[in-house]
């Protein structure tokens, strides 16, 4: 279906607006994936706070101009699905990596984070980033471990001094 100029401008504006506020982006090729699988992917993306859109390459290039994701422009070749993470940098990478495992025809082309182009083979760099809550939990466990070790050391010193005094 041919898109009119106004429709194209609206798509570019929408994708550009999302790109300006997104934390990371993933570009993939969804050629050969069934409609029901894509519908399921879109549903999971909404739940994960990930914006997913199939966009024409020229429109995608225009949409990412002047954003951190301009480095992705060369990966807009062939059918292009672009996913932006809005809440957590690794959300889109994690979602599309899991989807690619169950759909052999789905292929991740490239990723971008902080203006850096990341090859598809390095998807784990983003996919394994802990969420904010996970990072806080890890930090708290490290602090708690260090604190409890310090308290045990103080108790041992106290017990040792009590034994020497007795």
Swiss-Prot record:
Instruction: Give Gene Ontology CC terms.
Output: large ribosomal subunit
Q: Which is an annotated GO molecular function term of this record?
A: large ribosomal subunit rRNA binding
Quote the Gene3D superfamilies the UniProt record gives: 3.30.70.1730, 6.10.250.2350
Cross-referenced InterPro entries: Ribosomal_uL10, Ribosomal_uL10-like_sf, Ribosomal_uL10_bac, Ribosomal_uL10_bac_type, Ribosomal_uL10_CS_bac
Q: Name one Pfam family in it.
A: Ribosomal_L10
Gene Ontology biological-process annotations? translation
Please verify whether the record's keywords include Ribonucleoprotein: yes
The cross-references to PROSITE patterns, in alphabetical order and at most eight, read: RIBOSOMAL_L10
Task of the protein: Forms part of the ribosomal stalk, playing a central role in the interaction of the ribosome with GTP-bound translation factors.
The record's family statement is:
Belongs to the universal ribosomal protein uL10 family.
Oligomeric and partner information: Part of the ribosomal stalk of the 50S ribosomal subunit. The N-terminus interacts with L11 and the large rRNA to form the base of the stalk. The C-terminus forms an elongated spine to which L12 dimers bind in a sequential fashion forming a multimeric L10(L12)X complex.
Recorded protein name is Large ribosomal subunit protein uL10
- What organism is recorded for this protein? Marinomonas sp. (strain MWYL1)
């Amino acid at each position: 279906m041919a898109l009119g100029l106004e429709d194209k401008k609206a798509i570019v504006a929408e994708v550009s607006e999302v790109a300006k506020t997104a934390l990371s982006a993933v570009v993939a090729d969804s050629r050969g994936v069934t409609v029901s699988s894509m519908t399921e992917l879109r549903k999971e993306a909404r739940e994960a706070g990930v914006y997913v859109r199939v966009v024409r390459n020229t429109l995608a290039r225009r949409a990412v101009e002047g954003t951190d994701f301009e480095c992705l422009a060369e990966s807009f070749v062939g059918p292009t699905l672009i996913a932006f993470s809005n809440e957590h940098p690794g959300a889109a990478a994690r979602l599309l990596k899991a989807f690619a495992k169950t759909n052999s025809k789905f292929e991740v082309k490239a990723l971008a984070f902080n203006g850096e182009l990341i090859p598809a083979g390095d998807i784990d760099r983003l996919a394994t980033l802990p969420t904010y809550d996970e990072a806080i939990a890890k930090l708290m466990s490290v602090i708690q471990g260090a604190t409890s070790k310090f308290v045990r050391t103080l108790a041992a010193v106290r017990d040792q001094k009590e034994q020497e005094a007795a």
